[in-house]
């Protein structure tokens, strides 16, 4: 048990120096960094991600190979808008992608064509924020990693209806055709290409070069060759033939079209396979002119290879040519033009690098499975692969090998963001290269450049459709920091190329032993997606091949290696055959196991073994669970089903106005808060120089060299988000926790708020709870709350809604924002400003106008009255209608922010003033650029002082400053630093590094200034960037402060959820002997059947913590024991197990039995009654059936369904039933008559015919059946 200074938690973990958690967002951030490789110099980039896409698609040449477009390098420019601006304006946070391309001519006829190197704009790439998200059209989205079947070879088994076992081998590539080898009930092996046509496997073998029966049998060493002589053959009478005896002859015929004589080779079967050699056959063999025959080997176990003989019997082909033509006919259902084209089709299927790609993973898996040593660079199938797969299948049939477990994590891999983007860019660039080729072919003799060839929209349209419509690009769950971090670490088996809910069976959803330490067995959704969507465990990482690995410590001779080398990450495959000890197995100070028998894990078994047999040891007991499950204290005492609900409900906890970290935590809370990146953190050592509610300024320490090479100010400003709306309408509101003059170091958290307190995750509040019934109000999991919770804002949260109104240009004219709305009282528009937008601070009630807008009406002939009004008041009076945005029926709140974005619709006069401003902007920019370059040259002169050039070159490898020349101000000023090579300027390596850094920093600053100028020009000439067709966009943000109320859903961390049923005055709540009233009464019957005892442990320890003002960390599976609880309750002077007598708040009498009392952490969930309460009197109707719509969003009605009708029928309430089915629903005439009758006070009319009956009659008439109603 230890106490850490950082967060002052008493830790019950048995392991003192715990292995640190990896960065929880690494799965997203690293994948995207590896995709772009921006921090890597171009010459050192690995062939992966975006670089690999370019390498695969370039160079591009025209059909005659005259012109070649070559790829040199790619880079990105700074984004036009920052993240916050993109969210506010509804834009995508993206960076411009540019490529340096080289176009040259190889044709001597075009000598005048100069080689062109150009920077070409390829469109915007959505750029990942430092929080691992993408901002797409103003909304934060997450690209979820996909768990899919790994490329490679898979061996499976199925059972035919007649009980025969059928075996199959399927080769799955990254790109290209699938091929499957399968047996049938007749013990014949077939090959299926792309799940279409089947052909005997021997036909495929012939087509790939094993032409004769002899070649095929030799692969499996099944036949012996006998020279044909009479004496020789007589020795082998009674032996079986292994191959057909063929007579080959040539047939000549005249081609009718050309008149030429054409010869065709023919094969006649003289004796079939499996025939027994006898004296009659000998004569036939001698007559055929065959040189050699094949006989079955006598020493081979022929039954093992019976399938090969059976397949040869079914094989319709006798030579390579026949096999190739047969396969072509099967695949294409047509005759091939010639043998060469048929052969090309087969080569393209599996042996062409352009058409077929196993990928690095596929090759690795095939080599591993079949024990091959083929080079990792060979990404296509080889003959050896196919033969080895057939041999393995034969072993399977003979029960000498085992089938693959498809759910084993060695057979499933993860497609991370980077890989998914690689696939999308691959599609985009392939399309682009097609258009480039076409343009090259068309522009044969013209002078053209790379820019003329490339259409930037091709790539961006593919990438945008991926982010906008792909099932794995999801709207981020942003309810609280835990929800965010979990969403980014989620793995989905669904999506394109994955499973579908309907087809996924029980096995694929189930927990597998290889999930240990990789996929959480607890955290998965309830419902149709159970088991298909899972979460990464806390220590899990995804390796370069996409397999999930988990860390273990090595153990040798019963001693655990605690050194850095002793810790290693293992994939599911590497872990096979190893015995692994649990993370909390007792060890002595030397790392040796104390006990002579150790609980261990070996694949799916849990043996108890001596220490000498242990190979590895878990790094920590919490290795098995995900972040959310690791946040549940005493998880080991909860039933798994309830733990699943607990971990899922913590993601739904709304951030509260007043945050409060849990008294009983698990020790992972600080890491979650830090790695979620929702707080502002110091980047390095420095000093806080300014703090207020909206920003923090830090002056970072810099070394002399850093100071010298930098073009930036040493002080960095961080803006603090205030009441910022999240995707789920909860709020991010941070407040600073640092002060002026404070020294900070890298990773220090400087703010709190948004479910975070003092650098720890704080999703709910610590409240005093009693497990006792209270007047029946906590029946069936309902919760009784103390009024103090409402009064003191314990569970108060703030929710912000965004309301948008767009102004468009219509056919009838321009819409307009205004507070001058026709036929609306002054009272209704009192809070609108001159632009028609409600003022900040206004209180909003249902029906209030938020944004005033008028839109032109359709022209009709005005009446005399209208003519008069127009004559008096001008043209405005009658030709516009009110199109304002009004508050919905349930909306109440306060306006906290408004925004108006407009495109620059300019009059001639303002355009003239803009013309005058633009040159000034250019001048200002030129001055800034000049002073920046002067500063650069000054720095370079200091660095190159007294040094001579080693030959400074540009991208074309032309020497600009000659080798041996001295650096002068003039030579340095004349350089174009955008096209310069920054390495090896001088002979001093240290100075070279500084020169490189100075130039790179200069270019970064140069690009920033350039982007700033473009932005200013854009704002001036075009205005705000808005979607097409929209002239203005007004936004209003309304905050709602929601106290806890009856009907809200609350939950603990152990799956103990309930609805608030009554809020009781403080004086009426049950109280303890010292007069303390409890905050919450929970039903004790909610515990035994749910088996989530963790809540009781938490309550007792929480009470001790509150009394002693101590916070605890009890890590899962390694936390506080019952003895520890008793020790702390005794210290706190409270009853053991929390058993206390309570007194009735109403009468003051003591209850008969003691109840369990404690302090538990409770959350308020996002399911609030305010969002669900709804009532309808009249509202919209469905167009076809004329029945009321459903749902709160549509202002719909309550469905009176089949069972409700039965209930009224059972009571005999005929009139009520008729009314509900007619005038309250879809009797159109009846409902207007009923309304009229109610208004006039007349008796109710007779109901008419429901519209849905008319719909049915129309449908029947559509079928040609005529009906009339009498």
Curated annotation (Swiss-Prot):
One of its GO terms (biological process) is proteolysis. It comes from the Bacteria. GO terms for cellular component: DNA-directed RNA polymerase complex. Keywords: DNA-directed RNA polymerase, Nucleotidyltransferase, Transcription, Transferase. GO terms for molecular function: aspartic-type endopeptidase activity; DNA binding; DNA-directed RNA polymerase activity; ribonucleoside binding. It catalyses: RNA(n) + a ribonucleoside 5'-triphosphate = RNA(n+1) + diphosphate. Gene3D superfamilies: 2.40.50.100, 2.40.50.150, 3.90.1100.10, DNA-directed RNA polymerase, beta subunit, external 1 domain, DNA-directed RNA polymerase, subunit 2, domain 6, RNA polymerase alpha subunit dimerisation domain, RNA polymerase Rpb2, domain 2. InterPro entries: Aspartic_peptidase_AS, DNA-dir_RNA_pol_bsu_ext_1_sf, DNA-dir_RNA_pol_bsu_external_1, DNA-dir_RNA_pol_su2, DNA-dir_RNAP_su2_dom, DNA-dir_RNAP_su2_hyb_sf, RNA_pol_bsu_bac, RNA_pol_bsu_CS. SUPFAM superfamilies: beta and beta-prime subunits of DNA dependent RNA-polymerase. Its EC number is 2.7.7.6. The RNAP catalytic core consists of 2 alpha, 1 beta, 1 beta' and 1 omega subunit. When a sigma factor is associated with the core the holoenzyme is formed, which can initiate transcription. Belongs to the RNA polymerase beta chain family. DNA-dependent RNA polymerase catalyzes the transcription of DNA into RNA using the four ribonucleoside triphosphates as substrates. This is DNA-directed RNA polymerase subunit beta. It comes from Parabacteroides distasonis (strain ATCC 8503 / DSM 20701 / CIP 104284 / JCM 5825 / NCTC 11152).
């Amino acid at each position: 048990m230890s106490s850490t200074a950082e967060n002052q938690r008493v830790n019950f973990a048995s392991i003192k120096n715990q292995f640190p958690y990896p960065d929880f967002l690494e799965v997203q951030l690293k994948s995207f960094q590896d995709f772009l490789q921006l921090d890597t110099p171009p010459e050192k980039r690995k062939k992966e991600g975006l670089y690999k896409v370019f390498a695969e698609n370039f160079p591009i040449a025209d059909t005659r190979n005259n012109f070649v477009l070559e790829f040199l390098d790619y880079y990105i420019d700074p984004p036009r808008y920052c993240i916050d601006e993109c969210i506010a304006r509804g834009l995508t946070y993206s960076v411009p992608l540019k490529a340096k391309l080289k176009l040259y001519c190889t044709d001597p006829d075009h000598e005048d064509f100069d080689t062109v190197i150009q920077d070409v704009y390829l469109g915007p790439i959505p750029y990942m924020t430092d929080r691992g998200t993408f901002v797409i059209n103003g909304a934060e989205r997450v690209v979820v990693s996909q768990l899919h079947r790994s490329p490679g070879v898979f061996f499976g088994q199925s059972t035919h209806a007649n009980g025969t076992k059928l075996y199959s081998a399927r080769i799955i590539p990254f790109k290209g055709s699938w091929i499957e080898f399968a047996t049938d009930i007749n013990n014949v092996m077939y090959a299926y290409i792309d799940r279409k046509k089947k052909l005997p496997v021997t036909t495929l073998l012939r087509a790939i070069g094993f032409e004769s029966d002899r070649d095929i049998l030799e692969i499996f060493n099944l036949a012996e060759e006998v020279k044909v002589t009479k004496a020789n053959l007589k020795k082998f009478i009674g032996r079986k033939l292994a191959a057909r005896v063929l007579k080959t002859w040539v047939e000549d015929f005249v081609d009718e079209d050309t008149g030429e004589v054409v010869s065709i080779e023919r094969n006649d079967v003289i004796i079939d396979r499996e025939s027994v050699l006898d004296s009659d056959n000998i004569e036939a063999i001698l007559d055929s002119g065959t040189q050699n025959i094949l006989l079955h080997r006598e020493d081979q176990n022929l039954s093992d290879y019976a399938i090969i003989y059976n397949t040869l019997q079914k094989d319709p082909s006798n030579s390579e040519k026949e096999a190739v033509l047969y396969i072509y006919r099967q695949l294409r259902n047509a005759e091939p033009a010639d043998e060469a084209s048929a052969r090309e089709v087969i080569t393209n299927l599996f042996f062409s690098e352009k058409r077929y790609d196993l990928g690095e993973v596929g090759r690795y898996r095939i080599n591993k499975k079949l024990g091959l040593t083929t080079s990792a660079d060979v990404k296509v199938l080889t003959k050896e692969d196919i033969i080895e797969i057939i041999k393995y299948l034969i072993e399977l049939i003979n029960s000498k090998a085992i089938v693959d477990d498809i759910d084993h994590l060695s057979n499933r891999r993860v497609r991370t963001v980077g890989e998914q983007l690689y696939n999308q860019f691959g599609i985009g660039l392939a399309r682009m290269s097609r258009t480039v080729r076409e343009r090259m072919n068309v522009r044969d003799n013209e002078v053209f450049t790379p820019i003329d060839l490339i259409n930037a929209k091709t790539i961006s349209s593919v990438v945008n459709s991926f982010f906008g419509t792909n099932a794995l690009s999801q709207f981020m769950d942003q309810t609280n920091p835990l929800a965010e971090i979990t969403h980014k670490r989620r793995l989905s088996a669904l999506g394109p190329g994955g499973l579908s809910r309907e087809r996924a069976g029980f096995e694929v959803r189930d927990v597998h032993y290889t999930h240990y330490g990789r996929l959480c067995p607890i955290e998965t959704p309830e419902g149709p997606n159970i088991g298909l969507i899972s979460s990464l465990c806390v220590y899990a990482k995804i390796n370069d091949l996409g397999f999930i690995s988990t860390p273990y410590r090595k153990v040798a001779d019963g001693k655990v290696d605690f050194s850095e080398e002793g810790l290693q990450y293992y994939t599911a495959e590497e872990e096979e055959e190893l015995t692994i000890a649990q993370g909390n197995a007792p060890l002595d100070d030397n790392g040796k196991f104390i006990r002579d028998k150790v609980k261990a894990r070996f694949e799916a078994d849990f043996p108890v073994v001596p220490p000498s047999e242990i190979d590895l040891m878990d790094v920590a007991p919490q290795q098995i669970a995900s972040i959310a499950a690791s946040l549940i204290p005493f998880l080991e005492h909860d039933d798994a089903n309830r733990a699943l609900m607990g971990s899922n409900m913590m993601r739904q906890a709304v951030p509260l106005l007043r945050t409060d970290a849990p008294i009983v935590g698990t020790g992972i809370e600080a890491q979650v808060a830090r790695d979620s990146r929702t707080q502002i953190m110091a980047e390095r050592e420095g000093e806080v120089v300014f703090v207020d509610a909206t920003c923090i300024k830090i002056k970072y320490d810099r070394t002399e060299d850093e100071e010298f090479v930098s073009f930036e100010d040493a002080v960095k400003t961080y803006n603090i988000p205030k009441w910022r709306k999240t995707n789920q309408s909860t709020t991010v509101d941070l407040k600073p926790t640092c002060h002026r003059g404070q020294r900070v170091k890298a990773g220090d958290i400087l703010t709190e708020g948004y479910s975070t307190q003092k650098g720890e995750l704080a999703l709910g509040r610590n409240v005093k709870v009693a497990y006792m019934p209270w007047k029946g109000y906590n029946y069936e999991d309902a919760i009784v709350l103390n009024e103090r919770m409402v009064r003191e804002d314990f569970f108060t949260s703030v929710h912000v809604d965004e309301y948008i109104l767009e102004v468009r240009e219509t056919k009838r004219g321009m819409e307009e924002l205004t507070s001058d709305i026709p036929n609306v009282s002054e009272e209704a528009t009192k809070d609108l400003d001159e632009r028609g937008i409600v003022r900040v601070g206004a209180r909003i009630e249902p029906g209030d106008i938020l944004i005033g807008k008028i839109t032109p009406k359709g022209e009709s002939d005005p009446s005399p009255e209208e003519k008069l009004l127009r004559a008096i008041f001008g043209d405005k009076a009658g030709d516009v209608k009110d199109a304002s945005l009004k508050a919905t029926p349930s909306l109440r709140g306060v306006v906290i922010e408004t925004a108006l974005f407009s495109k620059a619709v300019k009059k001639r006069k303002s355009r003239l003033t803009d013309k005058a401003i633009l040159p000034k902007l250019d001048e200002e920019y030129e001055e800034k650029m000049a002073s920046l370059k002067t500063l650069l040259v000054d720095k370079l002169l200091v660095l190159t002082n007294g040094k001579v050039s080693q030959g400074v070159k540009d991208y074309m490898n032309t020497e600009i400053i000659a080798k041996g020349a001295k650096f002068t101000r003039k030579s340095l000023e004349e350089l174009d630093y955008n096209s310069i090579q920054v390495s090896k300027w001088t002979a001093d390596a240290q100075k070279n590094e500084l020169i490189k850094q100075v130039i790179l920093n200069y270019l970064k600053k140069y690009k920033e200034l350039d982007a700033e100028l473009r932005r200013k020009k854009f704002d001036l000439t075009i205005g705000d960037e808005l979607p097409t067709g929209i002239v203005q966009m007004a936004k209003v943000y309304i905050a709602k402060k929601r106290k806890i109320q009856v009907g809200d859903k609350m939950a603990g961390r152990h799956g103990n959820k309930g609805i608030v049923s009554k809020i009781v005055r403080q004086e009426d709540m049950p109280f303890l002997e010292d007069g303390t009233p409890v905050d919450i009464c929970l039903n004790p019957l909610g515990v035994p059947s749910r088996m989530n005892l963790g809540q009781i442990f938490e309550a007792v320890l929480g009470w001790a913590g509150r009394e002693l003002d101590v916070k605890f960390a009890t890590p899962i599976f390694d936390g506080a024991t019952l003895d520890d609880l008793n020790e702390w309750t005794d210290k706190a002077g409270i009853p053991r197990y929390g058993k206390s007598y309570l007194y009735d708040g109403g009468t003051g009498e003591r209850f008969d039995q003691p109840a369990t009392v404690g302090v538990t952490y409770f959350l308020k969930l996002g399911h609030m009654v305010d969002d669900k309460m709804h009532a309808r009197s009249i509202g919209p109707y469905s167009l076809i059936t004329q029945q009321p719509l459903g749902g709160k969003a549509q202002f719909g009605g309550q469905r009176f369904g089949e069972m409700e009708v039965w209930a009224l029928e059972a009571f005999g309430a005929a009139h009520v039933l008729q009314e509900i089915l007619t005038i309250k629903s879809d009797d159109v005439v009846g409902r207007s008559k009923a309304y009229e009758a109610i208004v006039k006070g007349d008796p109710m009319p007779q109901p008419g015919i429901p519209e849905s009956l008319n719909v049915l009659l129309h449908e029947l008439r559509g079928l040609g059946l005529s009906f009339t109603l009498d």
